[in-house]
Amino acid sequence: MIDLHRAVLGLGLAFALAVAPAEAAASSTIAIIKSDDLDAYDAPIDVFRGRIGRSVEVHTIGGDKAVGERLMAKLAADPPEAVFALGAKAAWLVSHQLPQVPMVHAMVLDPSRYGIDGPAVTGIRMQPPPDLVLAQLQLLAPDVKRLGIVLSTTNNDPMIGEAIQAARNAGYTVIARRVGNERDVRAALRRMPAEVDAVWLLPDPVVVTPRNFQVLQAEALAAHLPVLAYSEGLVQAGALMCVAPDPDAVGRMAADQLLRHFAGENIGVLDRAAPEVVRVVLNRQTQEAIGLTIDPTLLAFVDEVLARPRRR
């Protein structure tokens, strides 16, 4: 596990943890709202609950807008002290229907794309720093020189530009293709093996769909190309590897953002924080299928090796 967190928390946070009145903690309630009933959304909750030091209620909207709106109406009548929202649907509902309630979100791709913003909103970014991600690719697949990226024309996430620049700074030749629709996505993915040594999948709801991933996976396996993904789910589905946020760290960071708010900082001016701790996950079956040899000593830098893709 790679830990980038080298500084202690500020004095304001320490003060909040040490001297917050017991009666305030007992009477305060934090709402955790999950977009759906998924393991990925459950994973940060226990650490968040233990860190925040307040009563916590967990709600799931099950991907159903009507269920979400009923929950918003209930919470509007008796607002929680703050919200930890997991997933874009939950974060969007809270930011639009409970705009006065402080919220930290996580597991959200490109919040600005969905209008998840406001004076009481911050979050934990879904992407680790790109130079950290690329360092792991260089370690495990050092022969890669040309890196392919496919993006939709509507993807304006600032992280994309940061990722491309980081790849160039790391010495990669970047072949980036912008596409406008599903047909163009699949055509670009099919052309990639002739142009690159590896494909870097970045968060993009137009590009990364089940059908498109199947196309990419088939082409990459046939050409013996590594696919660097951004989530453990994609590695389980057949990508070679990912460098993804550690869920315990996400829960801790979300709690710390709210504790800073409770200590007197304005949550709306807190930057969306990059993950401090990441997990490197490798798909052994894919590694063998593409003929990639990895020195066994380097596996010490891998947090989990999947023997075979899991059922999703």
Give the location of each predicted region.
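Short hydrophobic alpha-helices and adjacent helix-cap/hinge residues
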Residues: 3, 11, 24-312
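Bacterial N-terminal signal peptides
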Residues: 8-20
